[in-house]
Swiss-Prot record:
Ranges of residues in domain S4 RNA-binding: 90-152
GO biological process: ribosomal small subunit biogenesis; translation
The protein's role, per its UniProt record: One of the primary rRNA binding proteins, it binds directly to 16S rRNA where it nucleates assembly of the body of the 30S subunit. With S5 and S12 plays an important role in translational accuracy.
GO CC annotations, alphabetized: chloroplast; small ribosomal subunit
Family (UniProt): Belongs to the universal ribosomal protein uS4 family.
Protein name: Small ribosomal subunit protein uS4c
One matching Pfam family: Ribosomal_S4
Quaternary structure, from the entry: Part of the 30S ribosomal subunit. Contacts protein S5. The interaction surface between S4 and S5 is involved in control of translational fidelity.
Keyword Ribosomal protein: yes
Keywords from the UniProt entry: Chloroplast, Plastid, Ribonucleoprotein, Ribosomal protein, RNA-binding, rRNA-binding
Top-level taxon: Eukaryota
């Protein structure tokens, strides 16, 4: 399944607040579609599917990528759902978004892809790059990169950076202090339902 490039507010009307997808708020609160205003009792499968879709659309990843992350999470000691969220949260594009250097994860992905971002003083152009504690993230020292990021910094963003990131706004650098705690994940969802959705697929 390819990455979604359609109307973002249509997705948030169906799935709820997805901070990584858009900060805009839909004026219409009913679900999209001809029968969107009709309240239907959700099935257990439907509930789990919806939680999975929240994860995909918020982080901007494909079905194949999500399945790979779940396989990876299952191979790490600990609670699989929490580890899955930590893997997604420690992606470079997500950290750039959480720092407020981009208004959405999609915008952060472009910053990384266009080589505006450095990790430990080395340009990294892979949005899915898995950051580690001790890594130092920075904006390239050129006028174009800094101008673009400063414009983004003026846009509304999440209220505060999570505690595992130490951000120097003046110098546009940040240090990764550790792995994100579950409580600092901005997306509201039940990750256990996501793991249950894939239980027979992986």
């Amino acid at each position: 399944m390819a990455r979604y490039r359609g109307a973002k507010l249509r997705i948030t009307r169906r799935l709820g607040d997805l901070p990584g997808l858009t900060s805009k708020i839909a004026k219409r609160t009913s679900r999209p579609g001809q029968h969107g205003a009709v309240q239907k009792k959700p099935t257990q499968y439907g509930i789990r599917l919806e939680e999975k879709q929240k994860l995909r659309f918020n982080y901007g990843i494909s079905e194949k990528q999500l399945m790979n992350y779940i396989r990876q999470a299952k191979g790490i000691k600990g609670t699989t759902g929490t580890i899955l969220l930590q893997l997604l949260e420690m992606r470079l594009d997500n950290l750039i978004f959480r720092l407020g250097l981009a208004p959405t994860i999609a915008a952060a992905r472009q910053l990384v892809s266009h080589k505006h971002i450095q990790v430990n003083n080395t340009r990294v152009s892979i949005p899915s790059y898995q950051c580690q504690p001790g890594d130092v993230l920075s904006v390239r020292d050129n006028a174009a990169s800094k101008s673009l990021v400063n414009t983004y910094l003026e846009s509304p963003s999440l209220s505060q950076s999570p505690q595992h990131l130490d951000f120097d706004k003046k110098n546009l650098t940040a240090k990764v202090l550790g792995i994100v705690d579950r409580e600092w994940v901005a997306l509201k969802l039940n990750e256990l339902f996501v793991i249950e959705y894939y239980s027979r697929k992986i």
